[in-house]
Amino acid sequence: MKTKYSCLNREKRVTDQKLGVRPRLSATPCGYILPMSGYEEEVQERWGDTEAYAQSQSRTSKYTHEDFAAAKVDQEAATELFVYAFGNSLPTTSEKAQAAVVAHRVAISKWFYECSIEMQKNLALMYVQDPRFKKYYDGRVNGLAQYVHDAIMAQ
């Protein structure tokens, strides 16, 4: 088993090197590279009256630093699935790309709020329209934001 695991890690490292993937090592409260401080007013204005916002506030208000780190790990795992699919030029409708879509939605639902397919599609629009979110994905691999968007929209 150890050999198989080592081979998978080597394969991932080679793929990452080919793509120029830049790893993310820090945990952030919302699971994205965006720091929460400085955005509270914008978040409140845009989503403050939604059920998702209330659910997220209720959940995260009880989280410890370890909880936020675990949420980050789950979201990074979903992002890595997108990186793999994109890096291997898989269609956005492929089984691997759609597994990344599901992992993305599950991570959000687990840690923040129930994320419906419709809600996830709204997030996908934000990933390509908001430069801050686009930078998060394209900071990993150039073009990843559009791929994530397209994969989510393809479900």
Please annotate each region the language model reported.
Residues 2-155:
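Amphipathic alpha-helical "stalk" segments
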